[in-house]
Amino acid sequence: MMKKNARYFLYLLSILSILGLMIVVSPAWSQEAKPETKAATATTATSQPAQAAEEDKPTGELSVSGLTKYIWRGYENTRNSIVVQPSMTVGYKGFSANLRGNLDTSPYAQSNINYSSTWTETDLTLSYSKTFGILNAGVGYIYYSLGAPNAGGVKPPDSQEVFVTLGLNTLLTPTLTAYKEVDHYRQYYFLLGVSHAFEFNKRVSLKLGASASYLQSDYADAVLFNAGGGYGGYPKFTDNYQATNDKFSNFHDGLLTASLPISLVKYITVAPTVSYAFPLTNDAKNEIKARGKQANP
């Protein structure tokens, strides 16, 4: 039943992606047949320098997210705890750098131990993107500095990824991103997503998004994984949530998101957000539960 639902979800994403391309291409062809007037030419000529100057300006963004749960690629990284995630991004001429952290205010424990808040993660992302007509293309690098889940806990090894992304400036903005882990975990992660925004007025809009992923492991070692510490790659798991020496290779997780950005003043926006994450296959269900907090109810 889960595999059937996953197929329907992926088919829907694919159809929406193709629909977005079809809708934008048709108007583009019709516009090419229209003769260009002198007035239009003059307007374009004068607007281009202003647009170029606008694009040359450095950009910056600061944000703080308060979440009821930290879920990353389907994995439940926190449980019964509020997490705080500050983020800072700077950009210039297509280049950008982002620094993001995660503070777990009440680390999960199977016993009655009450751990104090713990800084569990700091991520650095460097990227470059460029637009070619309706096509957006980008490359990047991510360094995940991972901390122990609680005081006295075992610190997992840090992780590094490179990624390539392709997107279309069409309805639903279909985007495909391929991530490759190049340090300890040795896996590929492919993510296909669509999104759309409905602007109610200048201050309030509704943003909807959906994504589906595929995980391809290059390495699996059940003994190392069961020993803990974050080693052992991405193995496939049995229905009893036991690691095997088989590499995971299947559709992984889906995500549905809705947010309501509200612009309070010029530089301050509040965005209530709700997300629903779920496994796409039975293999993914076992793997996600075994690796996340759900394995320790």
Describe the residue ranges of each PLM region.
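Cleavable N-terminal export/targeting peptides
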Residues: 1-59
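Outer-envelope beta-barrel architecture signal
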Residues: 54-62, 82-84, 93-95, 122, ...
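Membrane-embedded beta-strand positions of outer-membrane beta-barrel proteins
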Residues: 62-66, 88, 97-99, 126, ...
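Transmembrane beta-strands of outer-membrane beta-barrel pores
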Residues: 66-72, 92-94, 101-107, 130-132, ...
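Surface-exposed strand-loop-strand hairpins of Gram-negative outer-membrane beta-barrel proteins
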Residues: 69-84, 103-118, 247-249, 282-293
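Outer-membrane beta-barrel transmembrane domain signature
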Residues: 94, 179-296
